[in-house]
Each structure stands twice: as structure tokens, then as C-alpha cells.
Amino acid sequence: MKLALPQTALTTTSILLIQSLSAESAWTKHVIQPPVQGKIHSAVAHDWDADGHLDVLSSFDGEVVLLKGPTWAPHAIHRFSPGLARSKPRPACIHTCLMDVDGDGDQDFIGSNNTVFWLECPDQPFSGQAWTYRTVDDEILGSHCVLPGDVNRDGKLDLIANSSRDATRTPYPESLAWLEVPKDPHTAESWVRHIFADRDAPGGSHYTGFGDVNGDGRPDISCAAKGGEKFPEGNWFAWWQQPEDPTQVWTKHLLAADQLGATNILPADLNNDGVVDYFATRGHGFGVLWFKGPDFELIEVDPTLPSPHSLDLVDMDQDGDIDAITCGKEADGIVALYLNDGQGNFSKRTLDENQGSYDTRAIDMDGDGDFDILIAGQASKNIVWYENPLR
């Protein structure tokens, strides 16, 4: 499905410098998983066997699959089947992350597939045995994002997840939650749930961001939501301010409404003024943008980029400021890098075309000391990574 370009830019100043790909060395594309039958929404990377090569963990065609680097030999570690949760699973997780849930020193897998669950990494992750499946939360529903973060500042990671479905499908409709790991995650039926945005996140909420925005020492949480016929109150960017007691309801701050197809919003100091800003994308619409703190003026960066459904923020060129990477979700998507000059002015580099992505992450895939780009291809049905030519 191709989108029609917007007639006009949505708001305020557009700051974008177009930089040709030929001006610098091209990024090399490496295929981890060739196209499969179904869609691939998310992929994460870690060296599970400590052999010096990153492995990739993803889900597709009804299984969670561990791809052993550097040859990417597949090892199925879980098969989705009805009966493990109240809702029938889909062929793949909509989003995933890694977290040492049980504190044993290895990275466990957390996924959202009509329920939120975790798979315990065994001592021998490539032995052929299935990783043990356990429930995180089977009551929230519509968790388009699972994000680790120490919400209550107790030195232990928690999990942030959304519950976007309506009241006919979940007792926590149009809400956002953070979930505490129970004392014994191996035996607990579910994690400790805290609804911090109680029916306060309408529409098709997508991805969350985590970080202290107002400088009070307490991390806050941002979110974006698409709209549409099924999500009539979406199309917004907002953040929630953490109170002294994080188990209570948080204060919502709407950044912008009427943002067609809003999906991603992440906090970072983009102009090096010591104040937190937000970088955002409209992944079910058009454009990338940022909100300049502390007043959060909306500044368009590239208002016509189609379907930038994924986002990550890191210093890609190692010049001391935060850059952005994104990719369109359709099969003809554009892989784009926005290099920051340190003042919030961004130079666009088109790294590739005809590559879709639901999930894009910056990670050093080849161990050379710079950030590469890992992409789960969704409409492209593949997993690829792009090698940073910096080193």
C-alpha cells in the first residue's frame, strides 16, 4: 500500500539539508534472514554463546528463531500455539526486547504477541532445547512496544508496555503500564502491574520513550498513537510526568495533536543546550520531526518521508551529538540517516531504498566500535543490517 503525499507541511519550521550518498562511503547491506513467508516485525541482537559474534533473535512464521552469527544458522527456540494465553497468538511478535529477567547474567527474550511473555535463556542457548515460556501480563492487550527501563529507580529493570485495545477486549483499555519483575519470576503467574496512564492513551498507541524530561530526577515516559477508523482518538504525541510515587497515575502532557500516523517519540538533547527534546516520526503517515524543549516547539525535519515506522537515536558519526535513523515500513521503504550538526539541524542521507522496516535499531554488529543498523523487514519479510563505513 502506497500513501499519498500530504498537500502541505503540518507545522512550523523545516530544517533539513540534503546530503548525497556519493559524498561519503556507502553503507554495505548484509542479509541475516532472507525473505520468509510471513512478516518480520522485530529483531534484537546479543552474543548469547560469547563467541565474539553477535546473534540475532526474532520471530516469524509461527516461531521464535535464534540466528547464530556469523553464519546466521537458524535455531527455533519456541513455537507459538494456542492455549498459552487467553488470546490466540499471531505468527510473529509485534515487538521484542532483551532483559535479564531472573538475574542469572544472561539475556532473556521478551515479546508481545497478543500477550506479553518472556522466554528464559538456558545455560546452553543453542542446545536445541526450547526456551521456557512464562507470562509477563495476559490482561493488557495491544502492546505495540515493550521497553525495559528502571521506572521506580530501585536499580532493577522494569518493563514498559501499552494496552491499546478497547474495553471489549481488555480490562485496561487505551492505557499505558509499567511492570515490575516479581520476586520469583520463575513461579509467578504474572508481573506486578502499574497502570500509569489509565484510559489516557486513546487511539493506536505505538512506541514509547523513556527518560527524565523535566529534570526532577524521575524518568518520564513518552508515547505516540496513530489514528484512523479503528482508532478515532489517535494521531498525537505526548509524555507522562512521573509523580513521587510511580505506582500512582502520572500527569499527561500533550505535545501535539492532529499528527496523522504518529508512531515514535524518543527523548534526547538534540541541540546541546542541556534541555531534553523529543525526536519523533509519523510511521503510518509522513515525516520526521522534533520538539524543542523546554517549550517543545514542533520543528519539521523531513515532512515528506513516507511511513517512517521505526526510530533510534544515537551518535552515528561519533561527532558528539545525537543523530537519528529510521526506515519506511512498506516494501519500497527508504532507509534514512539524519546527521545532527549539534544545533538540531539535520542532514539527510539515504542509505538504501526498497527495504521495509517495522523495527530499526542501532547496534555495533561487527564489533569495530561504531554503530551499525539492524532492521526487521516487516513488508520486506527479511532481516538485514547495514555496515557503518566510519570504521
What is each model feature region?
Residues M1-L5:
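N-terminal secretory signal peptides that target proteins for export/translocation
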Residues P6-A9, L57:
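Short helix-onset patch at the extreme N-terminus, typifying the N->h transition
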Residues T8-S20:
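Bacterial N-terminal signal peptides
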Residues L21-R391:
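Beta-propeller-forming repeat regions
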